[in-house]
Each structure stands twice: as structure tokens, then as C-alpha cells.
Amino acid sequence: MGSYKQLAVDGRQVKMLFSPRQAQLLLLGIMLLIAVGMLLGIKVYLMLAAALLLTAICTRWRGKSWQKIGVAVGKGLYRSRHVVLILALISILIGLWKQNGTLATLIYYGFAFIRPEVFLVMVFVLSSLVSMLLGTAVGTASTIGIVLMGLAQSMGMPGGVVAGAIVAGAFVGDRSAPTSGPLHLIATTTGVRSEELLRYVFSTLIPTYLLSLGFFYLLGLLYRPEAVDPGTIRGFQELLAGHYPVALYLLLPTLLLLALAVCRLEIIPNLLFTLTATFICSLYGGFSPAAIFQSALWGYSPAADLPFAAVLSGGGLLSFRAILLVVMAAMSLTSLLEDTGVIHQAMASVLDHIHTVPQLILATSLFSILGVAVAFTQTVAIVVPGTVLQSTYQRLEVDRLVLGRTIADTGVAASGIVPWSSAAMSPALVLGVPVLEFVPYAAYCWLSPLVTNIFGLLGWVKRNRLPLDKGREGEAAR
């Protein structure tokens, strides 16, 4: 098909099979394919697989052998193994926490902190605490979120305001928790250690969280329930304690998870220790090994007529299979696009105009949010900028931890307020509130991009320590 120029990309020579125009058209076609599929209700992983097939056919047409295409796809699958294992362990952990009463206990004692004068603040705090344990915004909205919405409705609080506080808190953990799938995908994509990224994202989390607390305190002055009926809260607690295990010892695995994270233990050993502690708690609580295994694999399913059945069901390895397939398909697609130079060719004209740190942070933010807006999913918003911008961060001598943090602050945190994204629509469906009604009140979601760009303007970024090629050598293995 002709001769192609070789360019150094991320410390290696890559043959550019496509012209910049062809590369842009291919990426546009991939985005449109995914967008149309989402609108038609087709599963994301199927559309990513179709995009992978389209890219493979175009690559073969440009002269690359099927064997080399397979090698490139295999590299992507290999790179995804770390985050896939983490997500698998998290899915098992959530299933067991729902079965043995850990989540019910957390909700039970969480109600003790409800105060009418700071109701919205407490909704945000409780939601964020649960999300820091579950690591998923949808899971948080589906558990504590439903309960808090029911309590708020009994007090006549506006649904959009309360849903905004719930969603804001839910995305704290979706972005920052040790059990967060998106966070580990960011680490894998950018080639940094999950433990280092977990610590580094707190540099913007803390000011954003404090600003969000201030926002909900002020908002609570406008939307304040006259009183919280103690009987209503006691009723919720009695329903929980009457039908599910509630005991303080069940919180020990959650404390262990957080303590090991603070002690800088790597996430996989951390999850394995936490799973072991959870297994022991389940046995102590009277669950048989067979029942524990069933919840670990298929998730927990209480009887449909029990109160909170919809709240405390789910989890399990098989419930995460679609997410695992999305990650593997996205990493394989990105690997093939990298190997053919498509991403570099398509974005080179933009990347060449980035000369300062503020421009770099802004470009990362826009690329990441655009990924959510076009592909409706966090995965594309993480993988594409996490791959495309690494060489630009290297050129400006900015550490890849900053790249990971910026993606977390934008493609993950802000995805909750992109009205047509799955990250926003799922909590909306669970809570029964339209996305546009809670967007103005989901303060954390729209403050995160602002804070991370302010950090960029002020030059508060970590400078590069390692050459890019050396840093990537063991990215997934670590």
C-alpha cells in the first residue's frame, strides 16, 4: 500500500499506516458507531467489539498482516489483566457485603447521623462514605441513595436537590475509592501504580470535597426540612435490623480495607485480605460456604417481598461481566489504534499546540469530557486521553500521575452530569429523578473539573521523574 513514515511515539518507533485525514475519519467512524449503538440500546462491549473489527479491517487494508493485528490486540488484552482482576475481586466483595449484612449495618448506623439543620450535608457525606467503600456511583445510588431519597420524600424535600447531593457523593468514591474500577483503569492506562494514583488524587479531592460541603450547607439553608421525625428513622432502622444481619463486627472488613490502603499495601493483596476477613465474618454470621460462594459468583438476592430487597441485592462476579468485557474490548481497541499510529496522527495537530501546563490540563479535561459526551461511557473517556496525551506530558515534563488525576477529575467525576451518559442516566433511573433536575445540585461533579484546572493554572502539578518508556515497562504487573 505504499511507504509509510516512522515516528517515535512513547519512546518507540511506530509506522504510520494512515494519513492524518484518514486517521481522523477512522476515529470519527468509531465514535459514531459507538454512539449509534448506544442510542439503539446495544451493549457497549458489543459496539467496542464492532469498532475493533472495523479498525482491524481498515488496518489490514493498509497493509498490516492479520498476525501483527492479533499481536497488537493481544497486547491490549495483556495490559488489561491487572484492572480486570481488580474489578473481579471488587464484584465478589460487593456481593458478600450485601449478603452478610455489612452494607445493611453501614446504612443502619448512618441514619444516626441525620440532622435536619444539615440534612443535605449529611446526605452528601453518607453517600460519599458508602461510595468510598463500594467504589461505584451506580451501586451507591442503588443502595444508600434509594433509602435517603425515601427519607427525603417523607419530609417533603425536592427530589432534584436531594438526588444532586446523592449523586455528588456517589462520584466521590467512583473517582477516589480503593475499590473504584475507573481509578484502576486510569492507573493501568496511564502506566502508574494504583497505590500512587490513589494517594495523588486526594490532592484535588480534599479542596473539592470541602467546597461541596460548603455548597450543600448553603443550599440547606434554602431547602431545609422542618423536622426529621425520629420515628421515621427508627422505622427504617427496625426494618433493616429485623430482616438483615446488623452488627458492628461486620464493619471490620471495611475498616481493614481502608487501613491497608493508608498503609500503602498494593490493591490486589489489600482486596484479598479484605475478602478473607469478609469470608470469616460471613462464616461467623452463620452463612454456609456454599451460600457464600453463590453470592460471590451470582450476587445476593434476598426474597422479593423483604423490605429493602432492591437496595441490598446484587453484586457478584457475573454481574460485572459486562464491565469486564468493556474494559478488555476498549484496551484491545486502543492498543491497535496505538500500534498503527492512528491516535497520534489524528491528534497531532492539536497536541503540537500545547506548550504550557494550563493548556495541558485544559486539553486533558476537554478530551476526557468529550470522550464521555461522544461515547456515553467513562471507559473511552479514560482510555483515549490516557493513551494519547502521555507523550505530551513527557514533553512538558509533567508526571503521568497528573494525567491520571485530571482524567479522574473530569472523565470520571464530571461524567455524572453529562445528561446522556450512562454514568448519569443510571443513577437517574435508580433515584427516579431526571438528570437535568439534579445536575445543578451535583456540586462535586462540576466542581472537580474547575478545581483541577485551577491547580493547573497555579502550577500545582507533579513534575516528571521517569522517562516515559521506562515507566511503562511494568505498568500492569505492578
Where in the sequence are the language-model features?
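Extracellular/periplasmic helix-exit of transmembrane alpha-helices
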Residues: 91-100, 219-233, 280-305, 334-339, ...
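Central hydrophobic cores of alpha-helical transmembrane segments
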Residues: 141-147, 166, 270-280, 407
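Juxtamembrane membrane-interface segments at transmembrane alpha-helix termini
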Residues: 58-68, 152-159, 176-180, 281-292, ...
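Membrane-core helix-loop-helix motifs of multi-pass transport proteins
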Residues: 14-18, 34, 151-244, 399-476
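Membrane-embedded alpha-helical segments and adjacent helix-loop junctions characteristic
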Residues: 66-153, 305-391
